[in-house]
């Protein structure tokens, strides 16, 4: 009998599936109606469970929302860890990195995380710790992708914050207007900005 066939293995898989249903429920509700639409009762209802069962898996609505943001970060790190981003010329890597970021910013989980951040401006100590850890991972990743740049951690963080701010603004514009006019031109500008900054021109 394998672990997946054992009672413990089946229970673990069932628990994992339920957690995913809860998180997907929260993400879809936020996508459809914004942060306020993701009430505790509606998250549980859409997931097909009671709120008590949801609490068993996460503890509170706030824990669910924190988990959504964690997933968004994990998916971003998984994307930018792809080997192809570390291949080719500097210009090739800049183009690929910006495209990779943009693809992530179009995902429902990123948009849900953005809504959560905007709606809950008070930064908890736990979230601040998560932000710090995320920043360190992002800088490490940038050093790996742009290994031929001599920018310091501080300068790389400045570049990433600027790029993130521009692309988040473009993402919000796309959400509000249903489309982003001149999308490819905007992305080319982002690539030129990043290439200039990474080249330390």
Feature map (PLM): residue ranges:
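Basic, helix-initiating cap at the start of DNA-binding domains
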Residues: 1-33, 40-46, 63-66
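Short hydrophobic/aromatic patch on the recognition helix
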Residues: 47-58
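Amphipathic C-terminal alpha-helical segment
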Residues: 103-104, 119, 144, 163-181, ...
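Short, basic, alpha-helical segments at the C-terminal edge of helix-turn-helix-like DNA-binding modules
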Residues: 70-76
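Amphipathic alpha-helical packing segments from all-alpha helical-bundle domains
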Residues: 77-82, 106-108, 124-150, 157-161, ...
